[in-house]
Swiss-Prot record:
Keywords for the protein's UniProt record, in alphabetical order: GTP-binding, Mitochondrion, Nucleotide-binding, Protein biosynthesis, Transit peptide
Keyword Hydrolase: no
Stated name of the protein: Ribosome-releasing factor 2, mitochondrial
Limits of the tr-type G domain: 31-310
Matches recorded under HAMAP family: mEF_G_2
GO CC field: mitochondrion
Length: 741
């Protein structure tokens, strides 16, 4: 039996790599860079997997443990206290001649926006599955997000040391729940003591990790002739057969080879890389991050199978050698101020460089840093394909596209349009240039709707300004946090993705800004939609500071989900509309759309409604602010005529419980206006209920579920849209909004 020992992450070698990273790796060619995200359902072991990667790569000297609160990537106080990832964090490390920029993302549904922004910055992802649970609710969510970005991915089935882990079930889940095309590169085996080892399908080797040195060593053993070897050879043949069906190069080799046994391992790996990059297959690996098994081979797979930056994002070739960068995260450091994480798509960013956002904001990069969660190493320049932290950017927000100049952006847009075979703008005439830039380059952030809102008050009047500044900074970091001012109550109002999201915001304001704010009771973020189309005209004439202000506007509201603002192009109205300057149209549009943010019944956003401008007459010398205010008043007047209906947020739940508890749980759900979609078997003793229910009926539901099931049930929940309400429920919602219930 042949044995080979491999030692990864030795401190001497690690020290050398850290020195080298300041020379070679920060300037490494794009082909040697891997920008990856780590995605998972909460508690699948994602952060532990990341911490093991850092340890074996020599970036850390000790193993970070979630339960000990000493992790590198979960560095916020709230993350370490709760044992969950809240903010995406970026770390850079060297592994086998490659530079890996890794983003650890949240697994909780309240922080989906963090995941969404991070996926703009990566070229591939590792999806971590809990080997005892398979594909879970948030796994489906992050998988869908990865599909949207067309990201190649690897699967790491974690916790395979556990006695209740089921590898075959995980593979079945991938096929059934995600409609994925998994190819297994490894299979689990356990010795007489139940210690996990791995059989490698490509090399036909047994991999065993040594626990006495924290898994830094692992042994590769060629399997001797046996039933086990024959079974593994059959799996290797199946892998070759699968790959040859999707990869022509390997198919040609297979046709000219007398036996699958003669197909070289390197040919299989190259075919696997091509098929993974083309989203034809998803390689599956396994291990146990907590027990230090399988992590080095996972990092090898990242290098071998996930794409380099140069293999993706060809749309940005229109920038040539000029800078194009995507802002995917902003954090605030007590010493350094706002730090902006940028994925460099083209060109090179240097210290002291002047950059322009697609919104036209000019910025100067004061310093550049290499990321390691909340630690930083200063560098002078970073090239295309890499990830960098920029200090000194004052007005840039998460989701911005950065370039070297406005002319660079315009020239890139022109070249892109020419390459697409069109010289005309693909954006409607009313949209502005920044919106066109974001849309054309696929960077338009999809900010999810808030499902909860509450008032926020400072502890004293003197703290008001500091609180507002803290909220501005938090909004730059987190676009899903909504901050507005209620002119009726005079309160500042927060909108967020869930109870945990709002709780974390309050906690961060206290811990990071030393302001003990008071949050009002959580309110449901209802929406409104018009009951029927309506048309009205509003004419306003005033004298302000000696100047005559005169505006007359005719607007119509109609039911339409496709477009929020349009011009009525009927023959009787076009002569008037053609006389309006583009700037005036933009002012009218901004004022009218702004009025839809607060509906007449509960102050909810008015949706599925189109504003149709019929006619507008603007007196000479009338201020833009007066035109905007009149447009808003006209929309409010039409809303009072059309009337509105309430739409309530609906949540999708997956509840897993023992079979004998299901009837009691379903009886309780029926009292909460829930719609049961399905009840499925979940293992031998459990069942899973798939259900949709109004968010208003789910206050305190996790506690109620624990009581009903005597602590045996588990639940995941995520928003799944809005639904119309009946008149009784509408009246109750209005009373809640008015504080009468």
């Amino acid at each position: 039996m042949l044995k080979y020992e491999f030692l990864h992450g030795l401190q001497k070698r690690s020290h050398y790599l850290r020195q080298l990273s300041g020379q070679f790796f920060s300037r490494s060619y794009s082909s040697k860079i891997r920008n990856i995200g780590i995605l998972a359902h909460i508690d699948a072991g994602k952060t532990t997997t990341t911490e093991r990667m850092l340890f074996y790569a020599g970036k850390t000297r000790t193993l970070g443990e979630v339960h000990r609160g000493n992790t590198v990537t979960d560095y916020l106080t709230q993350e370490r206290e709760r044992g969950i990832t809240i903010c995406s964090s970026a770390v850079t490390f060297a592994w086998n001649g490659h530079r890996i920029n890794l983003l650890d993302t949240p697994g909780h549904i309240d922080f989906t926006m963090e995941v969404e922004q991070s996926l703009y910055a990566v070229d591939g992802v590792v999806v971590v599955l809990d080997g005892t649970a398979g594909v879970e609710a948030q796994t489906v969510t992050v998988w869908t997000q990865a599909d949207k970005h067309k990201l190649p991915r690897l699967i790491f089935v974690n916790k395979m040391d556990r006695p209740d882990a089921d590898f075959e079930k995980c593979i079945a889940d991938l096929k059934e729940k995600l409609e994925a095309h998994p190819v297994c590169l490894q299979y689990p085996v356990k010795n007489e003591d139940g210690v996990l080892a791995i059989n490698d399908v490509i090399t036909l080797e047994r991999l065993t990790w040594q626990q006495k040195d924290l898994g830094q060593k692992y042994i590769r053993m060629k399997l001797e002739p046996s039933d086990e070897l024959r079974d593994l050879q059959e799996k290797r043949n199946e892998l070759i057969d699968r790959l040859s069906g999707v990869d022509d190069e390997l198919a040609d080799v297979v046709i000219s080879t007398e036996s699958f046994d003669k197909v070289d391992n390197h040919l299989i790996e190259r075919a696997l890389r091509r098929a993974t990059g083309q989203l034809k297959v998803v390689p599956v690996l396994l291990g146990s991050a907590y027990k230090n098994v399988g992590i080095q081979r996972l990092m090898d797979a990242v290098n071998s199978y996930l794409p380099a930056p140069e293999e993706r994002n060809q749309i940005y070739d229109c920038f040539g050698s000029e800078v194009a960068g995507k802002v995917f995260k902003i954090v605030h450091d007590k010493q350094r101020g706002a730090l902006t994480l940028v994925r460099i798509l083209r060109g090179e960013i240097k210290k002291g460089m002047r950059l322009i956002s697609a919104r036209g904001q000019a910025e100067v990069v004061s310093k550049l840093y290499e990321p390691l969660a909340d630690e930083y190493r200063e560098v002078n320049a970073v090239q295309s394909g890499d990830v960098v932290i920029c200090a000194g950017l004052k007005s840039t927000v998460t989701g911005d596209l950065l370039t070297s100049s406005q002319s660079t952006l315009k020239n890139a847009q022109k070249r892109l349009k020419q390459s697409l075979g069109t010289t005309e703008s693909v954006i409607p005439e009313l949209d502005d240039e920044s919106e066109e830039s974001e849309d054309m380059f696929g960077l338009d952030p999809q900010i999810p709707d808030a499902v909860y809102f509450c008032s926020i008050e400072p502890p004293s009047i003197s703290s008001q300004t500091a609180m507002e500044q803290a909220l501005r900074q938090l909004q730059r970091e987190d676009p899903s946090l909504r901050v507005s001012y209620d002119s009726v109550t005079g309160q500042t109002v927060l909108g967020g993705m869930g109870e945990l999201h709002m709780d974390i915001i309050k906690s961060r304001i206290l811990s990071e800004y030393k302001i003990d704010v008071d949050l009002g009771p959580l309110q449901i973020a209802y929406k409104e939609t018009i009951e029927s189309p309506a048309l009205t005209t509003l004419s306003v004439e005033k004298e302000i500071a000696g100047a005559k202000q005169n505006v007359s506007i005719t607007l119509e509201l109609v039911k339409d989900k496709s477009e929020i603002f349009s011009l009525d192009k009927s023959p009787e109205n076009m002569p008037n509309l053609n006389t309006l300057r583009p700037r005036i149209l933009q002012v009218l549009k901004k004022g009218a759309i702004g009025a839809l943010e607060r509906g007449p019944r509960v102050g909810g956003q008015v949706v599925d409604t189109q504003i149709r401008l019929h006619n507008a007459t603007i007196g000479r010398g009338t201020a833009d602010s007066f035109v905007m205010a009149t447009a808003a008043q006209c929309v409010q007047k039409v809303l009072s005529t059309s009337g509105t209906r309430l739409l309530e947020p609906i949540m999708s739940l997956q509840i897993v419980a023992p079979s004998e508890r299901i009837s009691g749980i379903m009886a309780d759900l029926s009292r909460r206006r829930a719609q049961i979609n399905d009840v499925l078997p979940k293992g031998e003793r459990n069942k899973m209920i798939l259900v949709n229910a109004p968010l208003a009926e789910l206050s305190g539901y996790s506690s109620a579920l624990r009581t009903i099931s005597s602590g045996t049930a588990s639940m995941t929940m995520q928003p799944c849209g809005f639904s119309a309400m009946n008149s009784v429920d509408e009246s109750q919602a209005e009373r809640r909004a008015q504080g009468l219930e």
